[in-house]
């Protein structure tokens, strides 16, 4: 597997900074190469404050996590979860770019967008792909030292994914920049990796799923 690591993307009490630092050493020891930071209860990752900069203390913690990842040869990926209240307009696009630039200044060089577990206009896959493609052009490629984007789609499990050509996964496959990786959890939220589920999703997103 190209990506071997951990996604901190759960609900409830997030890990403490000390636990995260210890786990990064663990990842390095056991040859993991990716730590994706996206705890749902981090208000500056998700609603209501994803548009705002991290306070000084929290920003310092992010820097320490990045340095720990470098020491352990682990890619630090910072995720944002804007979908519950994002507006598909220029103002919120610039809010997102501004937040990415703030995180870039902290040392982040790999980014992810989560559109999971949301409702309302944020679930629109056409708007999601337009946003991701524009970010790839305006931010990732213009920086020159930022890794490809990763996205968690609203339909991240076969359990509720729309399998038709009008479904979000098929729209991703037809319109999403091929450099962007797409999360997939399998037949259910926590499931085994099987050839059948990979064939099912890969044929729709037209790329190998990020599992």
Task: Please describe what each predicted stretch is.
Residues 1-99, 105-109:
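Feature activates predominantly on carbohydrate-active enzymes
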Residues 58-65, 99-109, 134-136, 167-181:
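Short, Lys/Arg-enriched charge-dense amphipathic segments
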Residues 3, 32, 73, 108-110, ...:
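A general structural motif
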Residues 109, 115-117:
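Short, conserved phosphate-binding/catalytic loop or strand-edge motifs used
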Residues 9-10, 118-211:
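Catalytic-core regions of glycoside hydrolase
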């Amino acid at each position: 597997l190209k990506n071997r690591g951990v996604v901190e993307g759960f609900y409830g009490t997030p890990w403490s900074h000390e636990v995260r630092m210890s786990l990064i050493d663990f990842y390095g020891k056991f040859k993991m190469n990716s730590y994706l930071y996206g705890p749902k209860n981090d208000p500056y990752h998700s609603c209501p404050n994803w548009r705002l900069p991290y306070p000084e203390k929290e920003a310092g913690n992010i820097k320490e996590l990045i340095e720990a990842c470098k020491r352990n040869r682990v890619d630090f990926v910072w995720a944002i979860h804007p979908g519950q209240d994002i507006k598909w307009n220029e103002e919120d696009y610039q809010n997102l770019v501004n937040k990415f630039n703030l995180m870039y200044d902290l040392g982040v060089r790999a980014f992810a967008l989560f559109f999971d577990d949301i409702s309302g206009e944020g679930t629109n896959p056409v708007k999601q792909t337009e946003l991701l493609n524009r970010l790839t052009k305006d931010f990732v490629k213009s920086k020159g030292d930022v890794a490809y984007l990763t996205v968690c789609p609203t339909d991240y499990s076969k359990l509720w994914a729309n399998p038709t050509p009008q479904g979000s996964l098929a729209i991703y496959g037809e319109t999403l920049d091929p450099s962007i990786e797409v999360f997939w959890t399998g037949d259910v939220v926590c499931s085994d990796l099987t050839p059948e589920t990979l064939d099912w999703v890969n044929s729709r997103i037209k790329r190998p799923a990020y599992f």
